[in-house]
Swiss-Prot record:
Family of the protein in this entry: Belongs to the tectonic family.
Membrane topology designation: Single-pass type I membrane protein
Encoding gene, per UniProt annotation: Tctn2
Family matches, as InterPro entries: Tectonic, Tectonic_dom
Source organism of this protein record: Rattus norvegicus (Rat)
Signal sequence interval, chain numbering: 1-25
Upper classification of the organism: Eukaryota, Metazoa, Chordata, Craniata, Vertebrata
Taxonomy, superkingdom: Eukaryota
Subunit organization: Part of the tectonic-like complex (also named B9 complex).
Glycosylation sites: 76, 82, 146, 156, 389
GO cellular component: a single term: membrane
Subcellular location, record wording: Membrane; Cytoplasm, Cytoskeleton, Cilium basal body
Main localisation: membrane
Protein name in UniProt: Tectonic-2
Length: 700
């Protein structure tokens, strides 16, 4: 083994000293050794730092030997070095700073890199008490001129070449101007002698400067073991300047076109005359500018602003918008043209004003400012398409807008609906199938008193989720769903009135008395497949129940309604299964409501009572499942289908016989078997055979 240098030996002693001293509770520098390459370094003195003096001294190394450290007559100001001590929690933070800085290192701005360091020196930081040394910190200083960028940025304009013909940024790893970047072999600022130090560790790929590698399709490219089997069966003769990688790494952005305000849209593009489009169910609807899009809610709950609309797909979406975020600029409906068979369709747009914004806006805080003009926001958008065969004949758009303050805060609920109607459809009720129900279509319903009831409903909460602001949405066939809302109840609420109020809100969901058995049942003929809704009566709202007179507590409050719908498959039409409804039942669930108080019960503060509703579709098989191949081929062994049951031939000996104990049955069976064998042996053929064998043996 080679001998250790004095500097390495001293560093090892200081490191060992730094490891052992905290175990004894003595002061120690952490770390005990620092290799300094920047103008400033820091260390910490921990362990008994009270009444400790910290000082700095440069060490003069003679013939590779360090002098013995002493703690007498040391100063904080030592030549070009400055020592600062800052007390911290249970420690002292020691900062050593070089006064001259890096500006002194590079007086020549044209020099890109200097192989010789700017300063090489050894410093010793000592902690002492009453001239007695307690701890030492050894600092090895070696600072180069290009440790950091010291040059001013050039104000010259950089000419960016066209990347189609010349790679943009041929050396991406060249991050420092007028300085050599380590491991960047394409950096022109690196001297050959310096590049030799790291040329084996150069950055690879595009970051290392290989922005235009040679294509393996070129005949001049060298083949490797990783080339495909078909290469070089075909190759291309082309110069390196026409590399296919030019422009490959360019990802440009599309800048919007700003049209002048005086530009009119009365002119028609020649392409519009040939904009012919034929649709089938599920195809995206096209406009002259691209896809026809409407904000829609995704599966993750986010609102997609540019979701395409599919042909013959009705939908209803709800999006929540932050009022502080600027509303996106969308295409003006009047300027939109729908592509269809035979030309273009111009929509008919109707604007309406929204009322009662409190039901749509949550936390309606307004910051008033002088001279702030109101702004318009879109609350609802309704699109009605008229279609015939594979084309769109007309489009009616109804936009409901509201005027709010320019500094309105909170969130707003927006609704978007799309509906497709045939051209001969008028005010008649829309079918939900023909004849059976289609999945996702509303459940058809009616009221015998002639009320305008067409379906069952669930709540569609908005804003704060209160029942007073909740809208209604139809129950869709085959889709289990649940919804709810919050009802404000005071501490002095009358229980009878509370039950009546809750029952009234729950009855709004199921006002219908009959439900259509099929999707095309006639509303005018009650005998055309209409089923009466089976209702399980809710508790009497006016009944005198116990605890009903106590403030803040009401028993037997109906807060949940369950709608069970029995469905079945009733044949098929042209290979399509037809589903129908067999029965509908509604059932109420009650709870005991109690006012929830915090630290104190405030009489003027309302509590929130949650109301909920759920719908459940239960599928009942209309017929037995088709028998399998095993059931068809092996019915001869089925005792329930045949008069002769072979598996029960030895019934007393099988496990199905329970008349006697199992051991007794086995004993009787063995006895019966032995008697049977004896009877067979004593029969006439066996006796004749025995006599013949006996006579044959005598003759021999």
């Amino acid at each position: 083994m080679g001998s250790l240098s004095p500097l390495s030996f001293l560093w090892g002693l200081l490191l060992l000293q730094g490891v052992l001293r905290p175990l004894r509770g003595d002061p120690v520098f952490i770390p005990p050794f620092i290799r300094m390459s920047s103008p400033e370094v820091r260390a910490s003195l921990v362990g008994g730092s009270e009444d400790v003096t910290v000082s700095l001294t440069p060490l003069q190394i003679k013939e590779g030997v360090l002098p013995v450290p002493t703690c007498g007559g040391l100063r904080n100001e030592t030549g070009d070095w400055n020592l600062t001590v800052s007390p911290q929690a249970n420690m002292l933070e020691v900062t050593v700073r070089w006064k001259r800085g890096l500006d002194w290192c590079s007086p020549d701005e044209t020099a890109s890199f200097s192989e010789a360091p700017c300063i090489v020196q050894t410093l010793l930081v000592s902690a002492s008490h009453n001239a007695s040394c307690l701890a030492h910190l050894l600092i090895q200083v070696e600072i180069y001129p290009n440790t950091s960028v010291t040059h001013n940025a050039s104000e010259n304009m950089t000419v960016i070449p066209n990347q189609v013909y010349q790679p943009l940024g041929p050396c991406p790893c060249d991050l420092t101007a007028k300085a050599c970047d380590i491991r960047c072999c394409c950096d022109q600022d690196c001297q050959p002698e310096l590049r030799e130090l790291f040329e084996r560790f150069c950055f690879s790929g595009v970051f290392g400067g290989y922005v235009s590698p040679p294509s393996h399709h070129r005949c001049a490219a060298r083949t490797t073991h990783q080339t495909p089997d078909w290469f070089p069966f075909l190759c291309v003769q082309s110069p390196p300047s026409t590399s296919p990688f030019l422009g490959h790494f360019y990802h440009g952005a599309i800048s919007p076109r700003h049209s002048p305000g005086f530009e009119t849209h009365s002119h028609l593009d020649l392409r519009d005359f040939f904009a012919d489009a034929s649709y089938k169910q599920g195809d995206p609807i096209m406009t002259t500018n691209g896809y026809f899009t409407i904000p829609q809610a995704s599966l993750a709950g986010q609102c997609l602003q540019d979701a395409p609309v599919a042909f013959l797909r009705n939908f209803h979406s709800v999006c929540t918008t932050d009022l502080e975020v600027q509303e996106r600029d969308r295409l003006i409906p009047e300027d939109m043209r729908i592509r269809t068979t035979g030309g273009l369709v111009t929509p008919t747009v109707t604007y309406e004003e929204a009322t009662d914004l409190d039901k749509l806006i949550t936390s309606p805080d307004t910051i008033l400012s002088a001279g702030s003009a109101p702004r318009n926001v879109t609350v609802e958008e309704h699109y009605v398409f008229r279609w015939q065969n594979n084309s769109i004949s007309s489009l009616d758009i109804t936009i409901i807008r509201a005027e709010i303050n320019a500094h309105q805060r909170g969130t707003m609920t927006q609704r978007f609906t799309v509906k497709f109607l045939s051209p001969n459809s008028g005010g008649e009720k829309e079918f939900s199938g023909n004849p059976g129900y289609q999945l996702g279509k509303p459940v058809r319903a009616l009221h015998t008193d002639g009320m305008n009831v067409t379906t069952l409903h669930l709540w569609q909460p908005a804003g704060r989720g209160l029942c007073t602001s909740a809208a209604l949405r139809p129950v869709l066939f085959g889709e289990d769903a649940s919804s709810g809302c919050l009802l404000e109840v005071g501490i002095k609420e009358n229980c009878t009135q509370l039950r009546e109020n809750v029952l009234q809100r729950l009855d709004l969901l199921i006002q219908a008395t009959h439900v259509a058995r099929r999707g095309n049942s006639d509303y005018g003929d009650l005998s055309d497949g209409w089923l009466e809704v089976i209702r399980v009566d809710a508790p009497d709202a006016g009944a005198d129940l116990p605890l009903s007179s106590a403030n803040g507590m009401c028993p037997e409050v109906p807060t949940h309604v369950t709608i069970r719908i029995l469905t079945a498959e009733a044949g098929a039409v042209e290979g399509e299964a037809q589903r129908e409804i067999l029965a509908v039942e509604t059932r109420f669930s009650t709870v005991t409501w109690q006012y929830q108080c915090g630290l104190t019960c405030e009489e003027d503060k309302a509590d929130l009572l949650p109301l909920s509703a759920s719908v459940k579709f239960i599928n009942i098989p209309a017929q037995m499942p088709r028998p399998t191949r095993f059931q068809i081929n092996f019915t001869e062994y089925d005792c329930t289908r045949n008069e002769l049951c072979w598996p029960q031939l030895l019934y007393p000996l099988t496990q199905y016989y329970q008349g006697e104990p199992r051991p007794q049955c086995v004993a009787k069976g063995l006895m019966l078997l032995s008697l049977l064998m004896l009877a067979i042996l004593l029969r006439h053929p066996w006796v004749g055979m025995c006599k013949a064998w006996s006579s044959a043996s005598i003759q021999h």
